Amino acid sequence: MNNIWWQTKGQGNVHLVLLHGWGLNAEVWRCIDEELSSHFTLHLVDLPGFGRSRGFGALSLADMAEAVLQQAPDKAIWLGWSLGGLVASQIALTHPERVQALVTVASSPCFSARDEWPGIKPDVLAGFQQQLSDDFQRTVERFLALQTMGTETARQDARALKKTVLALPMPEVDVLNGGLEILKTVDLRQPLQNVSMPFLRLYGYLDGLVPRKVVPMLDKLWPHSESYIFAKAAHAPFISHPVEFCHLLVALKQRVLVVSES
């Protein structure tokens, strides 16, 4: 059986699992893991086929979620960034008893643009898939550059993301393609209407991949959830605004503890 790479840090009284985005790995959290591990028992995970979780091919969203769950604590706050937000959401839908709260970061339940739904144009995602076959390192770098565009620290943030990618062997092309296929096809807008645990959605005002127009639409569709927009962030608010980001998670932890004690 293939193993998921998993690292646990800290001894907080609430578990927090962090799931990274497409093309990346758990090293992306190093900018905040020290701070978070002083408040939580922190779980850093490389998604199947990414980073140190080798030996996996392209997986469906459901299979990716099940693979990650195998090594997870019984109960935790699940936080997913971008593609990781879909994985965390899938776990909240299929195993709600194991999710104390769901946090999605710069993530959309439907990344692909649809009728009356803002998102990434399907032909752009298909283009990325095609380009992966031609020059996959350059394609990944282009995708990373898109994630930080427009912020005051764009160049520095893009360098941080690139360093994360290059720190470990690149994922296989079929794994990257599989991740893009999930972004292109999955739509969890309706299913997530039914989750009952605390649900926090974090966005960057300048995000070029998850348009801010989706925020009020999802506020209306999911009135039980809360949203927060980082005014000067793009697709990676935890890199550009680490202090503010951690503060929101610590505040969520306090709410989760109140709920679990009542």
Swiss-Prot record:
Keywords: Biotin biosynthesis, Cytoplasm, Hydrolase, Serine esterase. Gene3D superfamilies: alpha/beta hydrolase. Substrate binds at W22, S82, L83, F143, L144, A145, L146, Q147, H235. Pathway: Cofactor biosynthesis; biotin biosynthesis. One of its GO terms (cellular component) is cytoplasm. It catalyses: 6-carboxyhexanoyl-[ACP] methyl ester + H2O = 6-carboxyhexanoyl-[ACP] + methanol + H(+). It is an enzyme of class 3 (hydrolase). The keyword Cytoplasm applies. Its main location: cytoplasm. Residues 15-242 form the AB hydrolase-1 domain. Monomer. Belongs to the AB hydrolase superfamily. Carboxylesterase BioH family. This is Pimeloyl-[acyl-carrier protein] methyl ester esterase. The lineage of its organism: Bacteria, Pseudomonadati, Pseudomonadota, Gammaproteobacteria, Enterobacterales.
